[in-house]
């Protein structure tokens, strides 16, 4: 049996996760937040006082812990870490871990396995170009830096995480630079991806736009 794959890529704060979750619920697909896997590893390293810049230690940690999705929640060794992985500390360190080739190879392998066994909507930075290069639909979702920062700031405040809009915006700018320049699987728009600029658009409007693309593809 062949399963459907929808890949949604884009920079931090573009609305990928929110859009992907809504689409998954509407289509009955499994939602896979690939970025949450890197965040979970980063959080676990920080929690256990492991030096983020110690590549060998991070690789060993990556292959020794169990990162899974439980009813759309992200878990490490069966501990739900949804809120913890969205902290400013994780935001400021996740790119250091995400650029380690051995880490990406291991987590990409897990992501590919998930996509082989069910219909999935997966979001991240390199899904359409590296993880699921043959995805049925590829979307590259973007937005202005200011709007992305505002969205992420509101998200953090609603979760009770103390930060400032300026700190969030600086973190996004730094993340963009690191994601685009990393040597292994950098943030890149797939040649066959549909670009959607979400600046000024509601989540529902973006979801409807992707659904039109999906329905058009299904009709052939």
Swiss-Prot record:
Coiled coil: none
Reaction equation(s) it catalyzes: CMP + ATP = CDP + ADP; dCMP + ATP = dCDP + ADP
Top-tier EC class: transferase
GO molecular function: ATP binding; CMP kinase activity; dCMP kinase activity
Cell compartment(s), UniProt: Cytoplasm
ATP-binding keyword on record: yes
Documented EC number(s): 2.7.4.25
Chief localisation class: cytoplasm
Domain of life per record: Bacteria
One Pfam family recorded for the sequence: Cytidylate_kin
Keyword Acetylation: no
Entry's Gene Ontology BP terms: nucleobase-containing small molecule interconversion; pyrimidine nucleotide metabolic process
Keywords: ATP-binding, Cytoplasm, Kinase, Nucleotide-binding, Transferase
Binding site for ATP: 10-18
GO cellular component annotations of the record: cytosol
Entry similarity comment: Belongs to the cytidylate kinase family. Type 1 subfamily.
UniProt cross-references to NCBIfam families, sorted A to Z: cmk
Protein name as it appears in the record: Cytidylate kinase
Organism: Alkaliphilus metalliredigens (strain QYMF)
Gene this protein is translated from: cmk
């Amino acid at each position: 049996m062949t399963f459907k794959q929808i890949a949604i890529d884009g920079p931090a704060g573009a609305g990928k996760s929110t859009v992907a979750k809504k689409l998954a619920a509407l289509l009955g697909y499994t939602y896979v937040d690939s970025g949450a896997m890197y965040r979970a590893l980063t959080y676990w390293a920080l929690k256990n006082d492991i030096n983020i810049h110690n590549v060998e230690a991070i690789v060993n940690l990556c292959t020794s812990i169990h990162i899974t999705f439980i009813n759309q929640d992200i878990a490490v060794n069966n501990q739900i870490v949804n809120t913890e992985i969205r902290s400013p500390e994780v935001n400021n360190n996740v790119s250091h871990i995400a650029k380690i080739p051995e880490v990406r190879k291991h987590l990409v392998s897990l992501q590919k396995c998930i996509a082989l066994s069910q219909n999935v909507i997966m979001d991240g930075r390199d899904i359409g170009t590296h993880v699921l290069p043959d995805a049925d639909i590829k979307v590259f979702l973007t937005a202005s830096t200011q709007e992305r920062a505002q969205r992420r700031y509101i998200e953090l405040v609603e979760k009770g995480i103390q930060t400032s809009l300026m700190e969030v915006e600086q973190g996004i700018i730094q993340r963009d630079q690191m994601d685009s320049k990393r040597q292994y699987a950098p943030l890149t728009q797939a040649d066959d991806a549909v670009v959607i600029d979400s600046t000024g658009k509601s989540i529902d409007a973006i979801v409807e736009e992707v659904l039109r693309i999906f329905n058009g593809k299904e009709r052939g």
